[in-house]
């Protein structure tokens, strides 16, 4: 189905099928940004002594609303939901610079969250790259990476991929007397895939010879956002959320352990 993207104002993206000929189905999706477009610092991660290798990422709609109108066989339907939209680009393959990352987004009460913890490959010092955006009532209130502490608890080895997985990940943001804690607790797995299994033929053989061991896992569970000021609890909100673990590299021996 051919599509075109119509850009409205800076807060609205509209994806419109230009031809409705696929089994008498047409779809009209309007994504309206609530949290303004955002980027972590410059949006670029730079690697190498000369900083010539780059990977960039921009959430153009960190949190938004979606209105959908779709027609099936002449019957028109409408529904609504929440939405997100981002872009990424670069001049180097991720597997060369990134060992693994956790990435999550969610909403709980008035809070909207984007949180990620990237670990560079050993060639680049296994450096941690925290990314964090916290908005309240659609206004960003915290996004400085040096104020973020990342924690993992309940680590076990996923038997399908052989990768270490944390049952709970937490992002702690300390800004003066204000402390925000974002916790994600896994309830079930949505995806557990070894990337090599999707590669066929000669590429599969080449990947095995290169000892490629990439995996992708996606989880469903609970997000909790709490705010303390001067040690006193201000508020706590919880909801459901999705997040992922992209693991390109080999698992370190110390990270591998059984299910607990």
Identify the role of each PLM range.
Residues 1-260:
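Structured soluble/peripheral alpha/beta segments that form catalytic or ligand/cofactor-binding pockets
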């Amino acid at each position: 189905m051919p599509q075109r993207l119509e850009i409205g104002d800076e807060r609205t993206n509209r994806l419109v099928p230009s031809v409705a000929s696929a089994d008498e189905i047409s779809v009209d999706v309007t994504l309206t940004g609530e949290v303004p477009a955002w980027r972590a610092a410059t949006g670029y991660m730079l690697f190498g002594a000369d900083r010539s290798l780059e990977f960039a990422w921009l959430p153009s709609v960190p949190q938004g609303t979606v209105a959908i109108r779709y027609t099936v066989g002449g019957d028109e339907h409408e529904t609504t939901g929440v939405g997100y939209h981002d872009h990424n680009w670069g001049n180097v393959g991720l597997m060369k610079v990134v060992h693994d990352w956790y990435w999550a987004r969610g909403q709980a009460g008035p809070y909207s969250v984007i949180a990620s913890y990237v670990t560079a490959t050993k060639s680049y010092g296994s450096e941690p790259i925290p990314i964090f955006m916290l908005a309240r009532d659609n206004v960003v209130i915290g996004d400085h990476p040096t104020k973020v502490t990342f924690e993992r608890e309940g680590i076990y080895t996923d038997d399908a991929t052989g990768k270490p997985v944390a049952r709970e990940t937490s992002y702690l943001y300390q800004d003066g007397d204000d402390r925000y804690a974002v916790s994600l607790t896994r309830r079930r797995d949505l995806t557990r895939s070894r990337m090599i299994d999707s590669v066929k033929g000669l590429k599969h053989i080449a990947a095995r010879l290169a000892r490629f061991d990439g995996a992708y896992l996606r989880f469903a569970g609970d997000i909790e956002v709490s705010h303390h000021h001067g040690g006193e609890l201000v508020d706590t909100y919880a909801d459901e959320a999705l997040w992922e673990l992209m693991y390109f590299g080999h698992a370190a021996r110390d990270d591998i352990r059984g299910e607990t």
